[in-house]
Amino acid sequence: MDVRSRRSTKSGPAEPIKALKKAHHNEESPKASDALPLPLYVTNVVFFTLFFSVVYFLLTRWREKIRTSTPLHVLTFSEISAVFALIASFIYLLGFFGIDFVQSLILRPTTDVWAADDEEEEQESILIKDDTRKVPCGAALECPLPQIAPPVVVSSKSALPKVIDTVPATTEEDEEIIKSVLDGKTPSYSLETKLGDCHRAASIRREALQRLTGKSLSGLPLNGFDYDSILGQCCEMPVGYVQIPVGIAGPLLLDGREYCVPMATTEGCLVASTNRGCKAIHLSGGSFSVLLKDGITRAPVVRFNTARRAADLKFFLEEPNNFETLTMVFNRSSRFARLQTIKCTIAGKNLYMRFCCTTGDAMGMNMISKGVQNVLDFLQNDFPDMDVIGISGNFCSDKKPAAVNWIEGRGKSVVCEATIKGEVVRKVLKTNVEALVELNMLKNLTGSAMAGALGGFNAHASNIVSAVFIATGQDPAQNVESSHCITMMEPVNDGKDLHVSVTMPSIEVGTVGGGTQLASQSACLNLLGVKGANREVAGSNARMLATIVAGAVLAGELSLMSALAAGQLVNSHMKYNRSNKNLTTPTP
């Protein structure tokens, strides 16, 4: 059998044996100081003291001779004695410390010792084998070592055992912490604070989880990730990270510039289809976008004793003179937050106030929440009977399909359009203008209306939005309202060419904060040229990212609709989006 083994960097079972044998060999080798009659420390102290004392005496005498112009070769009896004492002490010290060094060069270990070491290393390499037991790592430590079977010759490489990377064995200190977590003495969420090492905390938490559940996490990577970067910002109590492949669609020609669009997805055909749409747009002269609106929203809900008092606050907020004062209060929360509007609606004695503001290059939910809190504190001076029920009353509306977002917009409202040449429709998209226009009307418009869709008048906008969001560090949950889209297709130029557009009223994106600061997501933003905050024009990077999302959606809509019109959808998905793996193997 083809045995593949890795040298362990940890102390294995064979290392103590080797250490004992080497120690035994060293004990048999005679030392130069073994036969000294006096204790070593006594003789060493005497000769060290003699050596430095004589050196000091001679230097002092020679300095006096130089001052008095006495020849140096004229020596007194005391100086002659000092020279002999210096030579004697130097010979002793050289002999004592030099013989051990010479012995280490001359008296090498015998070949028998090295042969024994090689034999131990060979046994150690056999013991280091892949741990394929279906038990947690901690339980595996308590299990006896398996019997080593004799090697078996196999004729096929497919019969070789699969090599699985194992997690390094925990130290005694880590073992105590793991047991403390399992016993409930140490909260799992406090490991980062107590240890001061985020990677070590994740490793200990992971091992404790495996022992607690009895399930292996061998397929979930642990190493290769900066856990310090997510502390207190992106994720709590991490035990690893999930790998999602990132593909590139493009170049997307948008507003005269080319963009390579990163898409993180596990759906086959998605990147390829979007890439085909980008090609069709590029060959037709590119696409063009318009930013219609920019403003994130937050809508707190407050309650009064009567509906009349709720209406009084509504009228107060809608008064232009009062709005200027509220704007000053709101804008104090951040140098980027700028209040735009406050729209109110009443439900009985409850009032919902929908604040809308710009937030620079950040998506802005935290920023607007601070500004809203400032305004609520200010309003309670004039309306002390106002009871703040919640800073979010779902009139925002965040991460939920809502008509208010579809009509009023939330985040960035963008429309993107392109005119596709008839020749490109036929040669690249493999269909014709008439078929696309008819399919779009019956599917995206009539079909969605029959389904009672809210913002879903499109083929698959959420596919592209989700893929770009994950790749660039956006909030994937905000794909709900960010994917609101209506796709329009009309014949132009006497029916020869196709005008296609997507209108997306609530794209919620940012280029700073949240997941955008992670290394992988930051690299994807850098690829698009929108990494971080724009120092020249605040918010321009986030607005550009929103237009890129809309442009990618336009390409994806164009390609999928063409595949449907040409009857290619099933064939392409069977070719690129079908798994051939055996899914019947049980998971431990």
UniProtKB/Swiss-Prot annotation:
Record's catalysed reaction(s): (R)-mevalonate + 2 NADP(+) + CoA = (3S)-3-hydroxy-3-methylglutaryl-CoA + 2 NADPH + 2 H(+)
Region (Disordered), start-end ranges: 1-32
GO BP terms, alphabetized: coenzyme A metabolic process; isoprenoid biosynthetic process; sterol biosynthetic process
Subcellular localization, as worded in the UniProt entry: Endoplasmic reticulum membrane; Plastid, Chloroplast membrane; Peroxisome membrane
Ranges that cross the membrane: 38-58, 82-102, 544-564
Disulfide partners: none
Glycosylation sites per record: N331, N444, N577, N582
Enzyme Commission (EC) number: 1.1.1.34
Keyword Cell membrane: no
Enzyme class: oxidoreductase
GO cellular component terms, A-Z: chloroplast membrane; endoplasmic reticulum membrane; peroxisomal membrane
Molecular function (Gene Ontology), one example: hydroxymethylglutaryl-CoA reductase (NADPH) activity
Membrane association type: Multi-pass membrane protein
Pathway: Metabolic intermediate biosynthesis; (R)-mevalonate biosynthesis; (R)-mevalonate from acetyl-CoA: step 3/3
Primary location class: endoplasmic reticulum
Alphabetically ordered keywords of this record: Chloroplast, Endoplasmic reticulum, Glycoprotein, Isoprene biosynthesis, Membrane, NADP, Oxidoreductase, Peroxisome, Plastid, Transmembrane, Transmembrane helix
Positions annotated as active site in the UniProt record: E267, K399, D475, H573
Pfam family, one: HMG-CoA_red
Gene3D superfamilies noted in UniProt: 3-hydroxy-3-methylglutaryl-coenzyme A Reductase, Chain A, domain 2 (3.90.770.10), HMGR, N-terminal domain (1.10.3270.10), Hydroxymethylglutaryl-CoA reductase, class I/II, NAD/NADP-binding domain (3.30.70.420)
Tissues in which the UniProt entry reports expression: Mainly expressed in roots and leaves and, to a lower extent, in trichomes, flowers and stems.
Primary role: Catalyzes the synthesis of mevalonate, the specific precursor of all isoprenoid compounds present in plants. Component of the triterpene saponins (e.g. ginsenosides or panaxosides) and phytosterols biosynthetic pathways. Promotes triterpenes accumulation in roots.
Family per record: Belongs to the HMG-CoA reductase family.
Name listed for the protein in its UniProt record: 3-hydroxy-3-methylglutaryl coenzyme A reductase
Record organism: Cannabis sativa (Hemp)
Species lineage: Eukaryota, Viridiplantae, Streptophyta, Embryophyta, Tracheophyta
Gene that encodes it: HMGR2
